[in-house]
């Protein structure tokens, strides 16, 4: 719901100014569904669909960017309920993660574009991450 609440709060201001930029954060999980990740992937796909629909519905002066991080240093592996998958995810994350700073730089890249350029989607993942 956070993405929807953010849009609801900012959209009237952006429409009044006829200018603004949304930057929504999804995940590479919006492109892939695996065992035990169905609900997670569904929520991330929803963010992707909302972002794409919003981009098509708003004024041409309002930009909508979607950043889809791959394996990023976070608490995500700790939320996995299956013990085997959790152990595997933690081991993988130790070897194949990028920092939050890398994601912040992707956001900065999207924002820094000229006003007539909209970075619709940007997937950012570690070079070591081959799946997802």
Per-region residue spans from a language model:
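Alpha-helical segment proximal to the catalytic Tyr-Lys
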Residues: 12, 52, 56-60
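Residue(s) in the substrate-gating loop at a strand-loop-helix junction
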Residues: 27
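Short beta-loop-alpha junction of Rossmann-like oxidoreductase domains
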Residues: 71-80
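Conserved Rossmann-fold SDR core element
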Residues: 20-22, 48, 58-72, 118-121
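A short helix-coil junction within the Rossmann-fold of NAD(P)-dependent oxidoreductases
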Residues: 9-18
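Active-site loop immediately N-terminal to the catalytic Tyr-X3-Lys motif
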Residues: 32-38
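C-terminal helical subdomain
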Residues: 66-67, 86-132
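Active-site helix of classical SDR
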Residues: 7, 43
């Amino acid at each position: 719901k956070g993405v929807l609440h953010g849009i609801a709060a900012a959209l009237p201001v952006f429409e009044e100014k006829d200018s603004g930029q949304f930057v929504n954060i999804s995940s590479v999980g919006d492109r892939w569904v695996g065992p035990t990740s169905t609900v997670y992937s569904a929520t991330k796909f929803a963010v992707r669909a909302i972002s794409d629909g919003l981009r098509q519905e708003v004024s041409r002066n309002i930009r909508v960017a979607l950043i889809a991080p791959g394996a990023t240093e976070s608490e995500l592996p700790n939320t996995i309920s299956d013990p085997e998958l959790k152990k595997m995810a933690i081991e993988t994350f130790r070897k194949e993660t990028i920092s939050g700073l890398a994601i912040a730089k992707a956001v900065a890249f999207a924002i820094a574009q000229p006003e007539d350029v909209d970075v619709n989607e940007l997937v950012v993942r570690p070079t070591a991450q081959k799946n997802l």
